[in-house]
């Protein structure tokens, strides 16, 4: 099989391009995939060649239902070295915002799937670009949320500032989406205000606290309920072991 038949229907998607990369859709052996490659002006520069290789190494082992999966890293005629990913053709959140097509289903996925994907990235200590509407895709067929630009380097840990910036950027993106769909949900608006507070100390401490707030629950109330449950369990055990407990009826 020649390279011409291996790769067919290669089409540039300029709306999906990133700072250093061009994005294409194509068929590989007849199956639709996405292609990420360096822009022409960077393809022969060793620094940028190393950058795309590092991104492939960082992302290859990531596995999450709301993160685009990487399949391969190979040379493609006229495009050079490329990262090949699953086909995630659909609309970016930016396009939906611009066209005022954001609905409550999109908002619901941002409350759950998006936060879960962010948590997965943080747990794996992946340094990543700022979250933005251009990096969030709702797939064409079933509308699943997918992150398409999730990281370029794995580190021993992420800094406190990086974690806080994630929460800030999430608030900005959620706020734009709420504005686009005309949603005035008081809980979500409160979350946006706290995420984007100019003082990082006033933002949510972590994604777990953010998730609880999105569900309309506070972490403090959660811990109070846990404490009450534990106290009741201690009382029950003490009663069961007490010599004054009534003897069972035979």
Language model: regions and residue ranges:
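AlphaC helix of the eukaryotic protein kinase fold
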Residues: 42-61
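ATP-binding glycine-rich phosphate-binding loop
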Residues: 2-28
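Protein kinase catalytic-loop region centered on the HRD/HxD motif
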Residues: 116-126
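Activation segment signature within eukaryotic-like protein kinase domains
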Residues: 110-111
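Conserved short submotifs of the Hanks-type protein kinase catalytic core
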Residues: 77-92
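Conserved HxN/HPN-centered segment at the entrance to the catalytic loop
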Residues: 63-72
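AlphaC helix of the protein kinase catalytic domain
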Residues: 92-102
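C-lobe/activation-segment region of protein kinase-like
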Residues: 146, 150-190, 194
């Amino acid at each position: 099989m020649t390279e011409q038949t291996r790769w067919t229907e290669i089409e540039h998607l300029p709306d999906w391009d990133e700072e250093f990369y061009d994005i294409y859709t194509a068929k590989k052996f007849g199956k639709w995939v996405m292609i990420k490659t360096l822009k022409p002006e960077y393809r022969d520069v060793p620094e940028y060649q190393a950058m795309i290789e590092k991104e492939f190494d960082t992302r290859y082992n990531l596995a999450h239902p709301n993160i685009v999966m990487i399949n391969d890293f190979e040379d493609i005629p006229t495009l050079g070295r490329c990262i090949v990913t699953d086909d995630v053709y659909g609309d970016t959140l930016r396009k939906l915002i611009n066209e005022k097509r954001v609905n409550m289903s999109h908002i619901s996925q941002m409350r759950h799937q998006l936060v879960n994907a962010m948590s997965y990235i943080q747990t794996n200590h992946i340094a990543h670009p700022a979250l933005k509407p251009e990096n969030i895709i709702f797939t064409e067929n079933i509308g699943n949320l997918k992150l398409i630009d999730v990281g370029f380097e794995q580190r021993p840990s992420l800094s406190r500032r990086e974690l806080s910036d994630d929460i800030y950027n999430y608030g900005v993106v959620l706020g734009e989406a709420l504005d686009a769909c005309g949603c005035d949900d008081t809980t979500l608006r409160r979350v946006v205000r706290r995420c984007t507070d100019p003082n990082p100390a006033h933002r949510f401490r972590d994604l777990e606290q953010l998730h609880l707030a999105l569900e309309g629950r506070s972490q403090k109330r959660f811990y109070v309920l846990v404490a009450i449950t534990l106290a009741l369990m201690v009382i029950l055990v003490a009663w069961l072991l007490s010599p004054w407990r009534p003897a069972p009826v035979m």
